[in-house]
């Protein structure tokens, strides 16, 4: 009750009173933290600071928010990360991040999970103990581990489902008018299309086409992002205050999602508990059914708790929907933006037509999409330039004291290490004209090797799903994201549906120019409100 009274009082304050209150609160919090905090790895250099400096200046702290790309580029190129040395960089709020050199990547990927943990790192990053009420959804993310365990069967079942769902979503949201151009706000529409397509895999029909459920699902995702921004900048003492406040509406929306899931939950429980046939008896093939089947045997306490199962669905939605929406938005903008120079749209259509000729979705396999090398190249190039996780990649949390890096740094328990992934992906020593979107950069490389008889190995090396220390959108090593194979399928089916059935262009006021991405701290995001024109093709 006291919390609601406090929130009501805050709501009655004027704008400037609120700003003054927030600044005063943060000033006290930062002063308290400064007086009680020891330097973070005092022997390591600080990016952008003179030697022997042990604290980041206020100006460098502010650079994290208004010039982060340049600051991190300095840390990568000047003397540290690219040259085999760890370096410290400013992070959100009062925090400092440790950047490891690329030379330490293989060492880190070989460490056991009880020494370096990707799960703990993402639990800290996503702050789900506030937004979802517990850290278990990332520290024990079995809802995601199931995808890796059943990947082959999932992919083959997913192909016709994704094709059907994307076709329905495009018709609904882009329309079927073949005479007139329609202007859309791209990210808003892609959010709805991706939510529908991924929900076909996560909860199946008919819920994946329920607008109320899909809108709530994305509200929860945006609420989770809000909670991250409201907690990560602060020390734990302050997070305990800001976290519950920031996630209050998210918890209400999760309760409403639970109402949508309850009939489905009861139906699936009935199937599982009444069946007496072999494991191969037909069942729904969506992720929710897989989750219930697993929980029945391995997590009976969660199996019996719809609230926990609902939150695991929300965690799966966060992974599947949010990053895919951002990446697809960037992909489409890059295709339109490069069309005048590279004839991108027509080239992709030709490849799609050649690969799909004489087939239908029921006969498509993973190999069908492997042959789409130009589509693959476009997707990889878009991901290279628009790193979906910010600037840093392959985060690992240190779980025990005494672990020593190849450089001789004794890592402390609780430290999170990472790599400057986006800097490595635009390194001029590796790429010609690295800041330019070159849609067929990777398909040209594999074609050159085709002529030398190296086609299979070359294409695999440069494929969208192939990870390396220089390409980290999906991480690297044994914990590389297994969902990347599903993303690969979805992107290619999406391109096939979109480019086969629609013409694309810029609104007249864009004067043929692609709007630039924007930076928020270390996140590069699609231009807010970016619009495109679409028109159904007469095919």
Swiss-Prot record:
Alphabetically list the UniProt keywords. Heme, Iron, Membrane, Metal-binding, Monooxygenase, Oxidoreductase, Transmembrane, Transmembrane helix
Region described as Disordered: 439-460
GO molecular function terms listed in the Swiss-Prot or TrEMBL record: heme binding; iron ion binding; monooxygenase activity; oxidoreductase activity, acting on paired donors, with incorporation or reduction of molecular oxygen
Per its record, what triggers expression of this gene product? Expression is positively regulated by the cluster-specific transcription factor tenR and is induced during cocultures with the natural competitor fungus Metarhizium robertsii.
Enzyme Commission designation: 1.-.-.-
Determine if ATP-binding is one of this entry's keywords. Answer: no
What start and end residues bound the annotated signal peptide? none
What processes in GO biological process is this protein linked to? secondary metabolic process
Q: Name the membrane topology term.
A: Single-pass membrane protein
**Which pathway, per its entry?**
Secondary metabolite biosynthesis
Q: Name one GO cellular component term.
A: membrane
Disulphides: none
Q: Subcellular localization, per the record? A: Membrane
The protein's matches in InterPro entries, at most eight in alphabetical order, are given as: Cyt_P450, Cyt_P450_CS, Cyt_P450_E_grp-IV, Cyt_P450_sf
Required cofactor names:
heme
- Chain's role: Cytochrome P450 monooxygenase; part of the gene cluster that mediates the biosynthesis of tenellin-type 2-pyridones, iron-chelating compounds involved in iron stress tolerance, competition with the natural competitor fungus Metarhizium robertsii and insect hosts infection. TenB catalyzes the selective N-hydroxylation of the 2-pyridone nitrogen of yield tellinin and 15-hydroxytellenin (15-HT), respectively. The pathway begins with the assembly of the polyketide-amino acid backbone by the hybrid PKS-NRPS tenS with the help of the enoyl reductase tenC.
| Protein name per Swiss-Prot or TrEMBL | Cytochrome P450 monooxygenase tenB
Organism, scientific name: Beauveria bassiana (White muscardine disease fungus)
**Gene from which this protein is expressed:** tenB
């Amino acid at each position: 009750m006291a919390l609601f009274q406090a929130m009501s009082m805050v709501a009655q304050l004027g704008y400037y009173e609120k700003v003054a209150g927030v600044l005063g609160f943060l000033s006290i919090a930062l002063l308290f933290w400064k007086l009680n905090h020891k330097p973070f790895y005092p022997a390591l250099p600080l990016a952008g600071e003179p030697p022997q400096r042990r604290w980041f200046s206020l100006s460098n702290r502010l650079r994290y928010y208004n010039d982060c790309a340049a600051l991190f580029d300095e840390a990568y190129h000047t003397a540290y990360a690219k040259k085999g040395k760890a370096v410290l960089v400013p992070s959100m709020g009062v925090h400092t991040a440790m950047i490891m050199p690329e030379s330490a990547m293989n060492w880190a990927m070989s460490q056991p999970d009880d020494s370096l943990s990707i799960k703990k790192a993402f639990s800290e990053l996503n702050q789900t103990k506030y937004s979802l009420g517990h850290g278990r959804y990332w520290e024990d993310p079995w809802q995601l581990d199931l995808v890796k365990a059943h990947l082959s069967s999932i992919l083959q079942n997913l192909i016709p489902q994704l094709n059907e769902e994307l076709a329905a979503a495009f018709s609904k949201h882009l329309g079927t008018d073949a005479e007139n151009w329609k202007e859309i706000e791209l990210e808003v529409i892609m959010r709805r299309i991706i939510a529908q397509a991924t929900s076909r895999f996560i909860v199946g029909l008919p819920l994946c086409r329920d607008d109320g459920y899909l809108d709530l699902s994305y509200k929860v995702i945006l609420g989770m992002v809000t909670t991250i921004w409201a907690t990560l900048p602060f020390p734990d003492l302050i997070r305990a205050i800001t976290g519950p406040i920031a996630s209050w509406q998210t918890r209400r929306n999760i309760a409403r999602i639970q109402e949508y899931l309850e009939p489905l939950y009861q139906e699936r429980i009935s199937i599982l508990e009444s069946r007496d046939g072999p494991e191969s008896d037909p069942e729904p093939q969506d992720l929710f059914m897989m989750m219930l089947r697993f929980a029945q045997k391995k997590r009976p306490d969660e199996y019996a708790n719809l609230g926990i199962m609902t939150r695991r669905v929300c965690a799966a939605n966060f992974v599947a929907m949010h990053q895919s929406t951002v990446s697809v938005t960037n992909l489409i903008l890059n295709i339109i933006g490069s069309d005048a120079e590279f004839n991108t749209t027509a080239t992709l259509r030709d490849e799609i037509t050649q690969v799909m000729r004489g087939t239908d979705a029921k006969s498509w396999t993973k190999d069908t999409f492997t042959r789409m090398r130009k589509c693959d190249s476009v997707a990889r190039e878009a991901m290279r330039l628009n790193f979906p996780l910010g600037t840093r990649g392959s985060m690992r949390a240190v779980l025990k004291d005494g672990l020593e890096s190849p450089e001789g740094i004794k890592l402390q328990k609780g430290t999170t290490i990472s790599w400057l992934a986006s800097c490595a992906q635009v390194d001029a020593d590796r790429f010609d004209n690295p800041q330019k979107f070159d849609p067929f950069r990777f398909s040209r490389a594999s074609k050159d090797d085709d002529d030398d008889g190296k086609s299979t190995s070359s294409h695999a090396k440069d494929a969208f799903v192939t990870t390396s220390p220089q390409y980290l959108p999906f991480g690297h090593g044994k914990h590389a994201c297994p969902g990347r194979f599903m993303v690969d399928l979805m992107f290619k089916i999406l391109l096939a549906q979109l480019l086969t059935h629609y013409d694309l262009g810029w609104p007249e006021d864009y004067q043929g120019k692609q709007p630039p991405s924007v930076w928020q701290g270390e996140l590069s995001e699609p231009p807010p409100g970016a619009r495109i024109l679409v028109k159904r093709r007469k095919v």
